């Protein structure tokens, strides 16, 4: 499917929030919007998930106003996954309508809450099209490492590989964020060590598994290291908001050349 391209709008800074299902994308969207608003910046939220029922924030722009997931499922006799695929592809054809709403609101920051199933957004051409054609002066992506999933070193490597794959697909500067820090307790220290000392992570893998799983995990790890994987993983609590100041600073380095919102 070919989609109509539109001209860029200057001034707007766009933040995509991606991650595995249940990693806390919508909660972080809500917290980040609240943070910007409290500190004097005009932020708006775009919901890109056509199948979501309840959200912890008020949408400024909502794709559910443009496509009806349930109607498509009934009209074409599709299952839930098939309907989500078709609906997500249809969203790209509504880019002019979505952009007009964004232009009318004219925010400083647009926070984009991406679909729960990341493959529908990151690996289909419609998702890449939306990333490229939402008009914005600067864009970045926040990828969420679900703290509940990555307490195991093998799982950590798997999610790190996914994060790298998403960065490749979206072609955006990416900030990696660790969510649910309030739920993982003392394991937080180990996870943060893995991100700064890959030999520590490799030792943890060897203590957990052996054989083919060990070989595959360490080979992936070394490949990520060659690609410059070692980087800061910012811990965030979506419950308390702890860590948001560090996240905003990281966003400012990308979007505002280091100039932070007033706090």
PLM features: residue spans?
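Conserved beta-strand segments of the P-loop GTPase G domain that flank and frequently precede/overlap
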Residues: 17-18, 47, 111-114, 142-148, ...
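The C-terminal output helix
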Residues: 254-262
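Nucleotide-state-sensitive switch-loop elements of NTP-binding domains
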Residues: 2-23, 27-129, 135-140
């Amino acid at each position: 499917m070919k989609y109509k391209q539109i001209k860029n709008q200057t001034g707007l800074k766009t933040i995509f929030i991606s991650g595995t299902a249940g990693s806390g994308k919508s909660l972080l969207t809500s917290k980040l919007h609240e943070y910007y608003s409290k500190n004097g910046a005009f932020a708006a939220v775009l919901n890109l998930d056509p199948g979501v029922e309840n959200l912890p924030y008020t949408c400024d722009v909502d794709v559910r106003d443009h496509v009806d997931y349930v109607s498509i499922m009934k009209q074409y006799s599709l299952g839930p996954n098939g309907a989500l695929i078709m609906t997500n592809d249809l969203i790209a054809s509504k880019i002019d309508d979505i952009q007009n709403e964004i232009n009318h609101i004219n925010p400083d920051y647009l926070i984009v809450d991406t679909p729960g199933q990341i493959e529908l957004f990151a690996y289909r051409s419609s998702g890449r099209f939306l990333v490229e054609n939402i008009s914005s002066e600067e864009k970045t992506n926040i990828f969420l490492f679900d703290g509940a999933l990555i307490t195991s070193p093998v799982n950590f490597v798997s999610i790190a590989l996914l994060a790298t794959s998403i960065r490749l697909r979206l072609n955006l500067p990416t900030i990696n964020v660790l969510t649910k820090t309030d739920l993982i307790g003392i394991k937080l220290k180990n996870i943060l060590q893995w991100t700064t000392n890959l030999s520590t992570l490799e030792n943890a893998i060897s203590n957990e598994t052996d054989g083919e799983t060990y070989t595959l995990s360490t080979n992936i790890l070394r490949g990520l290291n060659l690609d410059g994987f070692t980087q800061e993983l910012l811990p965030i609590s979506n419950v308390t908001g702890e860590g948001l100041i560090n996240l905003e600073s990281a966003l400012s380095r990308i979007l505002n050349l280091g100039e932070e919102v007033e706090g």
